[in-house]
Amino acid sequence: MERRQDRIRNFCIIAHIDHGKSTLADRIIELTGALTEREMQDQVLDTMDIERERGITIKAQAVRLNYKAKDGKEYTFHLIDTPGHVDFTYEVSRSLAACEGAILVVDATQGIEAQTLANVYLALEHNLEIIPVINKIDLPSARPEEVKKEIEDVIGLDASDAPLISAKMGINIEEVLERIVRDIPPPKGDDTKPLKALIFDSLYDNYKGVLAYVRVFDGVVKPNMTIKMMSTGAQFTVTEVGYFKPGMLIPCEELRAGDVGYIAASIKTVRDTRVGDTITDANNPADEPLPGFRRLNPMVFCGIYPTGDTKYEELKEALEKLQLNDAALFFEPESSAALGFGFRCGFLGLLHMEIVQERLEREYDLNIITTAPSVVFKVTKTDGEVLYIDNPTKLPPPNEIAKMEEPMVKATIMVPNEFVGSVMELCQERRGIFKDMSYIETTRVILTYEMPLMEIVYDFFDALKSRSKGYASFDYEFIGYAESKLVKLDIMIKGEVVDALSFIVHKDKAYQRARRIVEKLKEEIPRHLFEIPIQACIGSKVIARETVKALRKDVLAKCYGGDVTRKKKLLEKQKEGKKRMKQVGEVEIPQEAFMAVLKLED
């Protein structure tokens, strides 16, 4: 006897950026007739403008498609679109947990890249059935046979009968659909057991509140049930359940084991629906949650301050709105003597930070200034207390610190072998510890390094791309904390510390960094009528100094020839005045000066 679930296939598509993931999704949606040709547009599943422009997927999306296979049966596909970028690894792993299989898209001209590898390993950890697919075979530079061999050597998947497709031209897409039916196992699950559903994403809807995107593993969920979140114990009453068609929500009577869809339960904030959490029936709860849930901790912090005509309240409102859809974004109010009131924000990584900044500027039309990104340091004080510090101004004085540790990451870099030397040199400069090196075929190398996150946060990615002419790809994962010689560098302008410019830096690099900053500030701060010393110091020791010279009026202009004592008197008087000004004068530091220092490239 055939079970209802035997005709369901849950799968996702994994690929490196630009290998054609969203295009393949578009073709699959078109072939299964989910959208008419009139409604089709490129990258159907990427709903944010930024996603389309950068060609990346940030939020996971899910659609239900019906497909009539060659065996005459009608199948239900749930395609879950996952983000491919390293910052969103946890979201990817949750999306993968909602599937039974994955389509691995590899570009026939590029071969395997670092992020493909990272996501494939995630898929293997979840025991997914992986179907390799080779895309872009319509391009003259395609080399499908070599790429097949690469997939077999590097990942160990049998790619001998991998479908060769062109998502753009729509070649061989049907073969992929047939492989999905044939190779991906149907969901296992039991309608009669207590409800267990995995949240793999959530979205804030202005009318329905938060929609939790779920994959039901056991049981049934329908409206008017009381559900409970297993990590927080919060309870809600379901108001609507349904599934996704591209760009639409279709309400239905119930979601059963094996289904993918959404649950609306007038939930107020995304915080209550944490990605990876398990939803269960409050009256008949499951014994234990689905595995793999963890709280997301921000890794990178920076200050965001309003400038120009943007008000603090507007910035606060915008951040709150962004947070409705982005549970990983963290922010708290902070004030700085130099920049006024603003927020300290925490992000998953650099891309996440850039996207949030860009959305604030574009979607909410705000003018903001951001301080240099920093990471979370672990500080053990002499009395044994352990602090986690995300803001250099909160660092205790040096005599109270027993040791400081910084976050380390394991970086995997794939690079063509002619650039190995310069990439290794870059990693050495960034205090990387060499771990491993292996060759793919004869042309490409995988390098593994352990590196301080602080060194990557700054502009590692750009430096890597420029040293390898854009060919290197890069992926990192957090591995823990390691002790390090770190110092806090303060910048003093006319004897006063400017809090917005303080940062924590490695001892060996402190001097170079300090030198560059004071030189930059000297260019940026306009001359006043008195001289302004700019000093960089560690504790009370000044390690670099520049002076902005004073402007002076020519007081002797009116003395022709005249008596030398008269000239002396005027000069003395000017000197007195300058001295007095130096004591009471205020230094105006323009906004551009801050921007210039925060943007200092290595």
Curated annotation (Swiss-Prot):
Recorded superkingdom: Bacteria
This protein's UniProt keywords: Cell membrane, GTP-binding, Hydrolase, Membrane, Nucleotide-binding, Protein biosynthesis
Entry EC no(s): 3.6.5.n1
GO cellular component: a single term: plasma membrane
Broad class of enzyme this protein falls into: hydrolase
Predominant location: membrane
Coiled coil residues, start to end: none
One Pfam family here: EFG_C
Example of a GO MF term: translation elongation factor activity
Cellular location(s): Cell membrane
Positions annotated to bind GTP: 18-23, 135-138
Residues covered by the tr-type G domain: 6-188
InterPro entries cross-referenced by the UniProt entry: EF-4, EFG_III/V, EFG_V-like, EFTu-like_2, G_TR_CS, LepA_C_sf, LepA_CTD, LepA_IV
Reactions accelerated catalytically: GTP + H2O = GDP + phosphate + H(+)
NCBIfam families: lepA, small_GTP
Family of this protein: Belongs to the TRAFAC class translation factor GTPase superfamily. Classic translation factor GTPase family. LepA subfamily.
Function text: Required for accurate and efficient protein synthesis under certain stress conditions. May act as a fidelity factor of the translation reaction, by catalyzing a one-codon backward translocation of tRNAs on improperly translocated ribosomes. Back-translocation proceeds from a post-translocation (POST) complex to a pre-translocation (PRE) complex, thus giving elongation factor G a second chance to translocate the tRNAs correctly. Binds to ribosomes in a GTP-dependent manner.
Protein name (record): Elongation factor 4
Species assigned in the record: Caldicellulosiruptor bescii (strain ATCC BAA-1888 / DSM 6725 / KCTC 15123 / Z-1320)
